[in-house]
């Protein structure tokens, strides 16, 4: 693995595809890591390579020889969500009939969460990151700060709420269901 976020090819048959074909309702709430989530490219220095001319050819830069990129692989790309926080993912998403995506970690989570946070707080950026952290002398670890984000607005609460709402909806009928709940934390940076 040369970088995080290699995408799963869109033509891959997933467990969710099989469950959906069998009559299941399927939902993804939160983090998934099924596609690229950053625009970062592999850096030669990461591997002790002094020059890009020593990198493998581009056709060997991914896990498959067929290129896996383009707009259809931008469902989890942070820059795409920053440009349009209300974009949503293309459904079905790897067999999930319903999906609300959370990208990254701590109080800096993006994806569908950013749109929700904007609808539920007048100035969401004032709650995010170490530059807006609360004073706390007990937090001294690198990549850690005491977040200003209230618990009810924190990504964990959002993902929990979505999952519980989905459970309530799905439980009201006789159709079987599968819900994947992917929390973004615990993960660095830590925001106790």
What are these regions (language model features)?
Residues 1-192:
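Formylglycine-dependent sulfatase
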């Amino acid at each position: 693995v040369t970088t995080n976020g290699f995408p799963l090819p869109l033509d891959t048959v997933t467990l969710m595809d099989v469950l959906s074909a069998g009559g299941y309702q399927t939902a993804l709430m939160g983090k998934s890591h099924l596609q690229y989530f950053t625009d970062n490219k592999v850096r030669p220095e990461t591997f002790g390579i002094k020059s890009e001319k020593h990198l493998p050819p581009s056709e060997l830069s991914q896990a498959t020889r067929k290129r896996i990129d383009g707009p259809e692989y931008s469902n989890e790309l942070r820059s795409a969500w920053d440009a349009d926080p209300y974009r949503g993912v293309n459904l079905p998403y790897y067999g999930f009939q319903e999906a609300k995506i959370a990208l990254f970690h701590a109080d800096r989570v993006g994806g569908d969460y950013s749109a929700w946070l904007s609808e539920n707080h007048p100035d969401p950026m004032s709650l995010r990151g170490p530059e807006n952290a609360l004073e706390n002398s007990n937090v001294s670890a690198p990549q850690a700060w005491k977040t200003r984000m209230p618990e009810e607005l924190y990504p964990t609460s959002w993902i929990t709420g979505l999952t519980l709402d989905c459970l309530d909806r799905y439980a009201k009928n006789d159709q079987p269901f599968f819900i994947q709940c992917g929390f973004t934390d615990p993960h660095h940076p830590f925001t106790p």
